[in-house]
A protein has these predicted regions:
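Secretory pathway targeting signatures of secreted, lumenal, and periplasmic proteins
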Residues: 1-53
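Surface-exposed amphipathic alpha-helical segments
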Residues: 9, 108-142
Length: 142
């Protein structure tokens, strides 16, 4: 798959190519992606279960959760993006799937502890990048 991302982010791949990080060195954030192939019907259900379990962990510590859905039937992209407010380590959690072969879990991670109000503008900046990533994604091989 491929997608657009901010020129100020640095792409870091793992050797097994099941994980990818976009590092934002100037603000010390990262968008971390976990890429899963869906080999059998139960895999989609298992990935959703894992995603919502992690989301629940972060949501319990939050002041609220806002969800945004994105769907592009032509490109077979189905996504939900969760913005989690308050003092959480991962203020954005999202998934992208084609519902048959691919599932990507993503999160915005803060690489430091900070006051939510002081980093809110940076979170909003990177949230726009997450939206662009989701909307520009193509499932073709890289």
């Amino acid at each position: 798959f491929d997608f657009y991302y901010n020129a100020s982010a640095v792409e870091i791949k793992t050797k097994n190519s099941k994980q990818l990080s976009l590092l934002y060195p100037k603000i010390n954030f990262s968008i971390d992606l976990s890429i899963q192939k869906l080999n059998k019907p139960k895999d989609l259900e298992d990935n959703f279960s894992d995603f919502y379990l992690l989301l629940d962990t972060h949501s319990k510590k939050s002041n609220g959760v806002f969800v945004r859905e994105y769907e592009d039937l032509n490109k077979r992209i189905f996504s939900q993006i969760y913005e989690i407010s308050g003092g959480v380590a991962s203020p954005i959690q999202f998934y992208i799937t084609d519902s048959t072969s691919n599932f990507i879990k993503g999160s915005l991670n803060l690489n430091f502890k900070s006051n939510y109000d002081s980093i809110f503008p940076s979170i909003q900046y990177v949230k726009k990048d997450v939206l662009i990533l989701v909307e520009s994604l193509n499932w073709r091989l890289r």
